[in-house]
Amino acid sequence: MKERKVIIKTGLNLENSYTSLPEIFFTRQSPSRVPSPKLAVLNYPLITSLGLNAQVLQSADGVDILAGNKIPEEAIPIAQAYAGHQFAHFTMLGDGRALLLGEHITPLGDRFDIQLKGSGKTPYSRGGDGKAALGPMLREYIISEAMNALGIPTTRSLAVVTTGELIMREAELPGAILTRVAASHIRVGTFEYVSRWGTVEELRALADYTLQRHFKKGYDKENPYLFLLQEVIKKQAELIAKWQLVGFVHGVMNTDNMTISGETIDYGPCAFMDVYNPKTVFSSIDIYGRYAYGNQPNIAAWNLARLAETLLPLLNINPNEAIKIAENAVSDFTKLYKNNWLSGMRAKLGIFNEEFQDEYLIEDLLSIMHKYGADYTNTFRALTFDNIEDTVLFDKMEFDKWYKLWQERLTRQEESKLSSKQLMKSSNPSVIPRNHRVEEALEAAVKEGDYSVMEKLLEALSKPYAYSKEQDYYSKLPEPSTCPYQTYCGT
């Protein structure tokens, strides 16, 4: 690997603090060389916020770094080890096709993982080729950047490069590598891994590292490991509520896909709900609906219980006391989630103050939307802009009754109607990454090499709350189909 290390002024300022952990947590590994890397898409706003050099990253040397052909001098590429409950079944996992180059320290002192996804085989590949296809990598780029624009914590996408390879999936597909940026890649599954195969000392090392990286205030607490658990629970309660508020269905909420930082990660089989239905499932492999839209809060609580189990040896020397502490912490999730969700739903309806009956008002609207097959995003958009006549709810008796109750509710607060409208506009996106529009962009890019469709989509998605007539195209529902939209774990 030494001959591949280069000094190129990309602006990357890499450290490798994760390698200070015991070696059970990672394996050093070089990226596979690729024959003909070309830049497909580069995230200029993210480059600016990270303090990187766009001009250099676009150069041949920069593209070689994004492809893994050249390695920044300070980088120590590693594949991270982790386990996970996949559809409730525990299994050993790890980075099977991704490598962490290191942690970039921004000019402001923030720390972000820089990971190459699709960079070749690792010891954790489990028979896979370690490669990634262009379509799924572009899909992750689109969805993750849309999530960021919506104000939802997420990993980010810095770049996608094509590799010049054809990789075998359901057919021969063009290969690609995505550069992912994350607060960290520490997962619930990372803790499960060391809990199952490591020592208590190694578990403590991971917990201490996580406190240092994400929850430094924990060192001042009487029980820092309880603080760690509580903070992760709070972050996940906030995150899942934000998913629900925009109709996002993750699709594969395995414990290895729940981050300790509270960021959304892994955009494989995800999609956004069109017609409101709590049972909405997109993933082709989720045949029993375990990860359906309406079940996501319950799954999050289940995953957090698995995290709590791993921390038992650190929570209290007495096993029974440790279990009580963990159970009390996890039991807080439901209330925390509900408070976040109710607060967000009030905002979507222009409500500033709290009343006990608000939950019934919200649930009644959702029930009516479900009954009549109303589009989730467009219904709230119609309420925001007073054009409900454009929805399927227009002239429905139940909705008329609900609408009057809502208008009456708005009078029981000090804020003006104008203030309510402004709150609704900032809480109800006009545009989301509709599944058919995403597929349209991917087909043009992958099959025709035309990235203009994707660029226009990304431009619309970058300002989801700023309504304009140009966004109407991206707000239209898909044509009725006998085949429901399905997603696959390509990313």
Swiss-Prot record:
ATP binds at G94, G96, R97, K117, D129, G130, R180, R187, D266. It comes from the Bacteria. It catalyses: L-seryl-[protein] + ATP = 3-O-(5'-adenylyl)-L-seryl-[protein] + diphosphate; L-threonyl-[protein] + ATP = 3-O-(5'-adenylyl)-L-threonyl-[protein] + diphosphate; L-tyrosyl-[protein] + ATP = O-(5'-adenylyl)-L-tyrosyl-[protein] + diphosphate; L-histidyl-[protein] + UTP = N(tele)-(5'-uridylyl)-L-histidyl-[protein] + diphosphate. The active site is at D256 (proton acceptor). Keywords: ATP-binding, Magnesium, Manganese, Metal-binding, Nucleotide-binding, Nucleotidyltransferase, Transferase. Its cofactor is Mg(2+); Mn(2+). One of its GO terms (molecular function) is ATP binding. Belongs to the SELO family. This is Protein nucleotidyltransferase YdiU. The gene is ydiU.
